[in-house]
Every structure is written in structure tokens, then in C-alpha cells.
């Protein structure tokens, strides 16, 4: 019997790493539906898109990590069911893998468009390395690029595309970009910087249809009636947690697989971590599903400590980062229910610091191009009493 980990992204690979760090001696099997060794996903929406030399993404761990730590990894292995009674997962090819403990690190998939024309050639999504390779090829062939969604991923892709001379328009349904992630001050500075680089923005704008020519996208039609030329449409409108396995196994699910503070699901032999998990976050003070590297690594460490019976790591504030056309954007803490913002901005140097307070307690920070300052602020964010 072994610990089986379904999903070999950041959460899954780090779970295997921490299990060995905490002294687990049994078998560990990583199951990945992809065809390549586990890799880092953040660069896919940044430098990888415009690189002329990178043939593959940066590995999460060197191949020697898996052999040296006696971690078995199976590629091209799509798990389709869990038999909780027999403690077995079954792959699409019929192969079965028995588990003592099962860790679901299945991640999330891109939210798909459903409007007229959404199936035309030239409508692209970005989640995997294959997606990134396909998108990189299409960027070379395209003059006019429309990015649907003004979140972090959408703006990273827009930044990369305008950097290689493409005409780029971002369509966002909200009144501002990154509305769910950062304060208006940070959003406005990012938007102004990208506009100066040539990125166009359509805010409060809703896509109603996509028109094509000879089976390929040609233009986007907005609710206002405006039509925008598009040789390539990149969709970044959020992600949906992969819940099929958990649902089929009758685990409790909501906007994610529901887990306790030890990452256990409603079946105590099964855990869930990373983008697919809905967990209580002490800094947010509620159940949340976070799609960040920090969250994936943190939950991987928690699940390993739980299985190995070691003390649970002390909670650390949520964090994220992004690179956007000469801007390093960093966020720390839970930007929620604040009652005071202290903003310092330098438009000439493109630097920003935002401190968010709740009842005089610092709960979150944002910085642009101030990495040392962000690092210094990290220890100032404490859990509520």
C-alpha cells in the first residue's frame, strides 16, 4: 500500500516532497495526466509565451528528485474513478492503483466560453504547457489579439503579447481590472502602465458573440454593438475546480472539495489540496479556495504533516505575485473587509505601496516594484485575536 497523489502540479509534487521531509518511509505514487515531467506553471503566461528558445517549461523538481526519494511518477495517467471501499483509484486505461491514503491535487480547469462562435479556431485557453506552446505559435501568426478577462493571467498574457508588437485589447466585464485581487490604486496603476505600452481596455464590457471567417475568429461583438478585430482570442475568465473524482466518490463538495484544517475530506482516508480544495483560511476567517503557488505549497506541507503525525506548520499570510511589463506586483494578507487604506504612489518610478487596515490592525499589503519593502512588511501581518 502507498500514498497515491492524483495530480502532479505544484500541490501534488510538494506533498510528495514534504512527506519525505517529514520521514514517511512508505511508497509514494504521483499520477499525472500530462505527458511531461511536472513543471512550473507561472512562467507559462509570462516569458514562456515570447521565448524563441524554450522548448519546455521549467521543471518543478529535477528528475533526480523522484529517483533519489523513491517517488514513483506515472505520466499520461488520467484517473477516472475512486473506489472508496476497496481504496483503489482507476485510470482511463483500466490500470488500478491501491492507496492507504489518497491525496487529490487535481487543480482547476479554465472556465469555457459558451457564446456564439466560442468553438471557432483561434479561441485559446491557457492552463497547461501544451496550451502555452499552442498559444505561442498562434501569437506569431496574429496581428490583433483580444484578451477576455482582466484578471492576473489575462493581464500577464496581454503584457507578453504587446511586448512582441501585437495589437492587444483587453475586454473586462467589471469596472476595473483585477477587481477580485487588488485595490483600485494598484489596478489603476497597472492599467495606466499597460495602456502606455499600447494595451487597449474595454471595461464594463460584455462579449455577446464571436464572428468568424472560414472557420477562424475574425471579430468580437460586445453588448454595446461595438465590434473589435481579432485574429486571436485568449480567454482568461477564471477557473473551475476539478471536482469530478470527488463528486463521484460522494465526498463533500462546494466550490471545491471541502476539507478540514488537516486537509482531510469527508472520507478520512482522502485529502485534497491546492486549487481544487475549499479550506478554512484563518486570515480570511472563512472557507476559501485560493489559486496561488503559496497556497498550494502551504497545503502540501499541512497534508504531509497530518499524515506523518508531526506538528502542523504555523499559518502564514496568503500571498501572490505577478510580473507585468516592468512591474512586479506583490500582495500579502487577506484583502477583505478593510476599513482604512494608506496609499503611497510614485507614478514616475511606477512604485506603489498599499497598507490595508481593519480596526487599526494591518491585514494586507500590496506593492508594485518594491520587493524589499514587501519582504519587510511580511512579519507585520498577524492572525486576528
UniProtKB/Swiss-Prot annotation:
Subcellular location: Cytoplasm
Enzyme class (EC, first level): oxidoreductase
Gene Ontology MF annotations: flavin adenine dinucleotide binding; oxidoreductase activity, acting on NAD(P)H; rubredoxin-NAD+ reductase activity; rubredoxin-NADP+ reductase activity
Catalysed reaction equations from the record: 2 reduced [rubredoxin] + NAD(+) + H(+) = 2 oxidized [rubredoxin] + NADH
Positions that bind FAD: 8-11, 32-33, 79, 156, 275, 293
Pathway: Hydrocarbon metabolism; alkane degradation
Predominant localisation class: cytoplasm
One Gene Ontology cellular component: cytoplasm
Pfam families: Pyr_redox_2 (PF07992), Reductase_C (PF14759)
EC annotation from Swiss-Prot or TrEMBL: 1.18.1.1
Entry keywords, A to Z: Cytoplasm, FAD, Flavoprotein, NAD, Oxidoreductase
The protein's required cofactors: FAD
GO process terms (BP): alkane catabolic process
Protein purpose: Involved in the hydrocarbon hydroxylating system, which transfers electrons from NADH to rubredoxin reductase and then through rubredoxin to alkane 1 monooxygenase.
Family (UniProt): Belongs to the FAD-dependent oxidoreductase family.
Record text on subunit structure and interactions: Homodimer.
PANTHER family noted in UniProt: APOPTOSIS-INDUCING FACTOR 1 (PTHR43557), RIESKE DOMAIN-CONTAINING PROTEIN-RELATED (PTHR43557:SF2)
Protein name: Rubredoxin-NAD(+) reductase
Source organism (scientific name): Pseudomonas putida (Arthrobacter siderocapsulatus)
